[in-house]
Amino acid sequence: MASGYDFGWIPVLLSLFTLTDASSQTVNQELSNIFNELWKLDVNRMEPLTNYNISLQGKAGYIPQGSTNVVDHASSPLFVNVDEAKLSSITTYARFMKLLDNYERSTGVAERVTAEEVTENNSFLDAILETAVMKRAHQYLIGKGKSRSDLRQFKSQLYYMWFRLYHRERNGGEDSSGFEHVFVGETKFGREIMGLHNWVQFYLQEKQNLLDYKGYKARANDVPDADDHVLNVQFSWHGLVKPVASAFVGVSPEFEMAVFTILFLTSTEKTTTAVVNLDEYQLEMVVHRHGRCIGTAYPKLLSSNNRHM
């Protein structure tokens, strides 16, 4: 889970951010509509209390970016359990998980992509393009004039956006990609966590004792529930601390790829933000571009349990 806000992961929302008053936000109704369509089509979403269980424990305190002096308000992991057999049985998750060990964690260290890794990237895209979620996203983007109807061209567009390597640091070789940053996570100069906004990666890193959940982040009267699909959290990873991260929890990789791709392609701004009402949540969706590639993408949780209604 992790930049600005930055953490790609479990259908939970994790990321660095400032909590703002949801009532002051202007909702993008068009994006809300298409994202809710995709939400309903996401048959591969894991169900809380059935396919996974989380333990929220205590509310995390304030810690400045770059500091490692953190008080742990969670003595146990965030994820109590996840039905890994179910995850592995779903093609998009299975192929997604194969990509998580393909990257160098530190920025400034050039990535070397093998032929096998290129094949894995393509296999993952092939899998998500077969889902109803990505088919609807593709249809929407065609209607907006942002993507070609030819499936091969759309796949090439996705590959460039998400997997093309670029320089995140000026020194060294091509050291990053949108997929690595958002879904896998990176560290910068050994001082801060960037990206890592995905719940599956969060769970797997926690399981390996590489990531330590420190507690949830929320406004005074907006305490999260164990069945929430978006969370703000604090955690440490390889000895570094992410003060606030936001991420989806339980959602499928195709859902995250779809919503962030739509937000990216329907705007030309360096940083695009859009407030959307999604299911029972109000979110600020954020995408930062690195040329024609994804720089980062994450959701900020503004309110849950329909408190914004």
Swiss-Prot record:
It is found in: Secreted. Monomer. The lineage of its organism: Eukaryota, Metazoa, Chordata, Craniata, Vertebrata. One of its GO terms (cellular component) is extracellular region. It comes from Danio rerio (Zebrafish). Glycans are attached at residues 53, 121. PROSITE patterns: ENDOU (PS51959). InterPro entries: ENDOU, EndoU-like, EndoU_C. It is an enzyme of class 4 (lyase). Its EC number is 4.6.1.-. This is Uridylate-specific endoribonuclease C. Keywords: Endonuclease, Glycoprotein, Hydrolase, Lyase, Manganese, Metal-binding, Nuclease, RNA-binding, Secreted, Signal. GO terms for molecular function: lyase activity; metal ion binding; RNA binding; RNA endonuclease activity. Belongs to the ENDOU family. Residues 27-303 form the EndoU domain. It catalyses: ribonucleotidyl-uridine-RNA = a 5'-end dephospho-uridine-RNA + a 3'-end 2',3'-cyclophospho-ribonucleotide-RNA. Endoribonuclease that cleaves single-stranded RNAs at 5' of uridylates and releases a product with a 2',3'-cyclic phosphate at the 3'-end. The UU and GU sites are more efficiently cleaved than CU and AU sites. The active site is at 181, 197, 242. Its cofactor is Mn(2+). Its main location: secreted. The keyword Ribonucleoprotein does not apply. Residues 1-22 form the signal peptide. The keyword Cell membrane does not apply.
